[in-house]
Amino acid sequence: MSNEFRFRFPVGTTMSFAQYMDIALYDESFGFYATIGRAGRRGDFLTSPEVGPLFGALLARRLDEEWFALGSPETFVVVEFGAGPGTLARSIAFASPECGSVLRYLMVERSAEQRALHAEHLENWMGDLDAAGVDSFVGGHNPGPQFASSSIAPYGITGVVLANELLDNLAFDIVRHDGDGNFERLDVHHAEDGLEFVVAPTEVPASFAPVLASAAAGEWMPLQNNAVQWLTAAIDRLERGVVIVIDYGAPTSEIAARPDMGWLRTFVGQERGGHPLDAPGSCDITTDVAVDQLVAAVAPTVMATQRQVL
């Protein structure tokens, strides 16, 4: 545990697991993605873009399909959330999609360290933009493809909002029910000898209750309210177009049934890590996306396996 964490969250502090996870992954001083975490063959985990160029090439073809479906607009905006080091954008650029001449590709990433990597091997990179710069970028009419980075996403998008393996890294709570409509959650408490889980009564949003009740009583499961909020906000950013989310997932009941909370995983150096409370900021924390929690909030136009879509 870093001294920075100890200073900001002294002994006696208690927080929800969602608060803890967000800090452990994204805090600017010691968060995993803000300091040491990185995808890729030399990083801590592999996603499809890091395996090779084929995924990016197939997704480039999918972007062309969406561009044609929108009537081939003169400016076609792709906003990729959780862009990491920019590998997917580079793969799409290398594939030379037909929409490239009008493409404005914005890589949205919370981590300044990750954004600093976006210019590597990516031509026509227009910089790390503030809010005014983002609006100017997505509204521009200069020949594309053009790429830019920001921690800020625009509204009024004509194009595609894209997220590849983002939702599994959005902070979630850990809850269970007793079969009678009562819920408990795991909080994180800073005790004298380190961090520990403590159980506390809680309430869940009414829209989640039926889905969570599908799990057996007493089984811990992720409550992915942040993922649902991200999805609804992404849809609100569109004027015309689609949201494409790619991630690994399963129904809530299936996730909860895994023994010993096996769905709660950490990774470091491309290997499974230890307990998520052992050393905040030292590892990736992730879980399967509970797809039925998303569907309960927003009915998808298409939900299919990655193979079926690509």
Question: Whereabouts are the PLM-identified features?
Answer:
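Rossmann-like AdoMet
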Residues: 1-81, 85-157
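Class I S-adenosyl-L-methionine
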Residues: 4-7, 155-310
